[in-house]
Structures are given as structure tokens and as C-alpha cells.
Amino acid sequence: KVKEYYGDGSNFGVKITYIYQDQPKGISHAIRLCKDFIGNDKFIVYLGDNVLRKDLTDYTKKFTSSDSDAMILLCEVDDPQRFGIAQLDLDNPGKIKKIMEKPKDPPSNLAVIGIYFLTPKIFDIIDNLKPSWRGEYEITEALDNLMNQGNKIEYDTVTGWWKDTGTP
């Protein structure tokens, strides 16, 4: 239905390229499929089940003008065990200590929302991932590995309205 509606994008003043993920192997797998298309450019992954009231202009400017290898958006939630979570490093303000997928005992209530600002460095990380217990290549694990290998990951917080429509 998406391709049917948007087509090649010309009716909307844009050019759309479709890249298909033939099996549900996780977000990191889907990102990896785009490697040749992206080349050496910084890029944004915006999961279709996320709705954000604020536009991405300020976040995009922050990321494109930085030397960060990734930037994630965080939002406080009441039920953090249902989301990928970021634990901030209290000893180093502005730094992330750990990123994890749907922990049973979350160390924070900061959900990693489904909008990721990335550089091509993520592809080498994804190439070395193993499938999770769910059989997926997890974006949270890729981001955590990117960070643990000494790459710079920034974050910003979403204070306005945000909804993950894929999470009841």
C-alpha cells in the first residue's frame, strides 16, 4: 500500500527509492540492506510506527553539524521494560552508559525512540552482530557496540508529544 500511494515520489516533489527486507530480521538488518544506497553520507532512520509532534529540523541540524557517529532521541516513559532503553552515565553528564533492548529490570525510564541519526560507521558494527534471542539483529545492540568501540554517540530528549504506535 505504501508504494501504491507514494509511487516514485514525484507527486510529492521527492524521489523515493524502495529497498525491501524480505524477512523480518530486525532493524539493523534493514539498515544494512541500505549500505550501497547510502554510501558515505550521514543518514536518518525513522521507523514508520513512530509519531513525533515536533519536526526533525533542530535534531538534524544538531547531528549534521556535529562530529558524532550517531545520535539517538530519548523520551521518558512509564513502562520502560517495553522499549529499548538508554542508561545515562551519571559520572559523565551528557554521556550514555548502556543501551539495551526491552530489559526486564530497566535501569532508567528513558526509551530510545525509533528515530536514529547515523553515519556509515554503523555498517561495520552491524556486519559483526549476531541474532538476538528473538532471531533479530537489534539496533540497540548495534548502537551499544558502536559506543563501546569508542565512537561518539550523542542524545537529545524529546519533551513534546511522541507515540510508538507499534507498542500498545
Annotate each PLM feature.
Residues D78, R82-G94, I99:
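Ligand/cofactor pocket segment of small-molecule handling proteins
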Residues I19-Q21, L73, D156-V158:
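Conserved beta-strand termini and adjacent loop/short-helix elements that scaffold enzyme active sites
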Residues L52-F83:
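Conserved donor-nucleotide/metal-binding helix-loop-beta segment in metal-dependent transferases, i.e.
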Residues G7-G13, L88-L90, L146-M147:
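Short, conserved catalytic or adaptor-binding loops enriched in Gly and charged residues
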Residues D49, E76, T167:
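Active-site glycine-centered loops adjacent to acidic/histidine catalytic or metal-binding residues
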Residues K1-L47, V51, L56-D58:
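Conserved N-terminal catalytic core of the sugar/cofactor nucleotidyltransferase
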Residues F12-K15, G39-K42, S66-A70, R82, ...:
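Short coil/turn connectors at secondary-structure junctions
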Residues I44, T60, T64, N92-P168:
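Catalytic-core segments of class I nucleotidyltransferases/pyrophosphorylases
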